[in-house]
Amino acid sequence: LSADGEIIVIHDETIDRTTNGKGFVNALSLRELKVFRINGEHTIPTLKEVFDLANQDCLINIELKSYDATEKVILLIEKYVTKKGWKYDQFLVSSFDWNALQQVAFLNDKIPIGVLTETNLDLALAFAKFIQAKSIHPHFHLLTKENTAQIQQKGLQVFPWTINEVEDIQKIKTFNVNGIITDFPNRI
């Protein structure tokens, strides 16, 4: 969230690496953030702007970076469902912050949830079952063809991250995952 409470779409907690500016996202207002540029031309988008740009043409995976943004993200999704004709299954809320995911499940159990994990696949699976998640998002090194099939047999989709090297992408595709999280979609 920006300093004035807007939902900002950016990977890091600062703008230092991805823009021509410096500072923490939560210390800058939306107006201040809009001054800075990504790759010299694009402004930092709000989540609403991303929804409008996507215009229902794709699944939107929203990774919650902070628990503080949870309720606002839920409210924005609900607005697009009730006022703009979107469907809940056009969204997927994921996070490493399992408290945030539990809050999503508690506040609106229609919103699909993806459980992110970097280390413990079994614990993530147990948590996913507990909150009735739709998918599991493990670091790709945790996956084998066998455990991918086992996860899917339990009714969960598998979206591994972040797979950027062509060789790794080709290998993971042989596991029959449901999707791949990458910085380079053109390599898929």
Residue ranges and their predicted role:
Residues L1, F36, K65, H139, ...:
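Conserved residues at the C-terminal ends of beta-strands
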Residues L1-A3, I15, S66, E165, ...:
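Short, glycine/acidic-enriched loop or turn micro-motifs at the edges of active sites
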Residues E6, H11-E118, I131-K134, K154:
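Metal-dependent phosphodiesterase/phospholipase catalytic core, i.e.
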Residues N39-I44, G114-I188:
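C-terminal active-site rim and adjoining tail of enzyme catalytic domains
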